[in-house]
Amino acid sequence: MRTFTGGARRAGLAAGTLALLLSALPPANAADLAGGGPRWCPTVAGHRVDCGSLERPLVAGEPELGTIEVAYAVVRHRGPGAARGTVAVNPGGPGEVAIGKAAEFAAGLEGLEDHDLLLVDPRGTGKSEHLPCGVTDAEYRFGTRQEQRDAVARCARALGPRARGYTTAATADDIDAVRARLGVRQLTLYGLSYGTYLMPVYASRHPESVRAVVLSGAYPHDFDPLVRPSAQAVSLALRRVCERSVPKACDGEKAVRDLATTAARLRERPLTVPITAGGKTYRERFTEGKLANLMFEAASRGVGMDPAGPSLLGSAPRALDRFVKGDTGPLRHLVQEEGSSGGSEDQAPYIAVVCNDYRKAWATDAPLTVRWQQYRKALAGAGQGGFGAFSGQGFNEGPTDGGDVCMSWPRGNTARPQPTDLELPGVPVLVLSGDLDANTPDANGRLAAARFRGSAFFSVRNAGHVPELEPTGCVTGVTSRFIRTGTPGDTSCLQGLAPIAVTPVGR
């Protein structure tokens, strides 16, 4: 689910998801090897890189809507002889680029000297052909909830029937078309964040082409459309960071009470916070929903990447304490710091995929008035206890890929939701989750793992969204071993990562 990357999309737009960690790893020392392909083909030290693109139908079975170019890069293995396999990586989103992170991904999978790495930029992103709708990252991110819903409707109008071309199934089929062109018999699928939604769809549509699956920061296709696991995980993460802090920096129960008080005050009286991003200044109306987004999504990103350094999650207990005591400064600072990465990227690949595919709390074929009735009934039936420190309505105004944000996505010209009852192949599957991640919490990771027969699920202590970001190499060692052998081997290090630094509340 969505993660912002210094102005790019998540999830998925991620703070690079895996790529941020990988960019910190040492590059190969060997000279670059000559590859083949267009001028945009990336250079990866010590590896040959072959690139290309292929023309794909925008919407299968509707030739009148035209075609779209999908770009790919293959980072060839370093060792002698033929590759033992090919790993296809998707870093999240929807809409995160892959090819632009080729060097970082290759460094992160450096142990796989006998495997090739396949990177496909999803349609509408990176080196693939773009199909914009005129909604930017910053305006969507910083807008009020009504403005976000209006942006969704505007995006749909701009795309028209072409909106049907933005689906997870279409991206999965694009990847398989690339696989077929390359003559690769089977892929090991590696999905991060939204990639954990995409790769099972690929596996269900092309089971004979799947060798194994790795999912990191996972969630199931039939996830709760009211996002209750994430709401509850925010409180759990606050309790855990306080409990594990050395020396003890905060009281977890007090931090949760402070969060509830902050949410209630913002529900009644939002803040106005100026945010500078991309050379522009925006005035964000910081509501309970914006607090929810800050705490479940942004605060989960990059946790554990630098355990001793500052982080949003580690700073949150003190900021909440100060807010309750009348000092809004620390919380404002966190909002401004997190928002500074807002950018100008077009959000069509993000908005259209989540509004076409994701499960909703209403019938997508219902008229707008009925949708609102069904949504409000679902919220009322959920009760208040299921949303942790937040109100149900307030929390559901936080997700940019859920809650009520797709309410105005039209019935006409759009795709049917992605089916949730996937038939999946019986291949080796590894699922990882960070136990401080409220974006794709352990509860959702376990549900995602349960969809595969015989899968292995591991919760990584003191890690956030996409645990490969941790710096010791423990997690990437486990995943590399799994890709090579089909088993994770010794996983004891997953419970031994250092706790994150927490700003003392007393200061």
Residue ranges and their predicted role:
Residues M1-A31, L54, I175:
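Secretory targeting and sorting signals
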Residues L33-K290, A352, Y358, W362-R507:
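Gly/Pro-rich cap/lid or specificity-loop segments adjacent to the active site
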Residues R162, S245, E297-G302, E337-E338, ...:
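Alpha-helix C-capping/helix-to-loop hinge sites
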Residues Y219-A237, D321, T328-G343:
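Flexible "cap/lid" loop of the alpha/beta hydrolase fold
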Residues D258, T262-R265, S315, A319, ...:
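Charge-rich, solvent-exposed alpha-helical interaction surfaces
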Residues R269, R318-P330, E337, W362, ...:
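Short loop/turn hinge sites at secondary-structure boundaries
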Residues P274-L294, S300-G302, S340-A348:
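Structural motif
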Residues E297-D321, K360-A366, T487:
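Short helix-capping/linker segments at secondary-structure and domain boundaries
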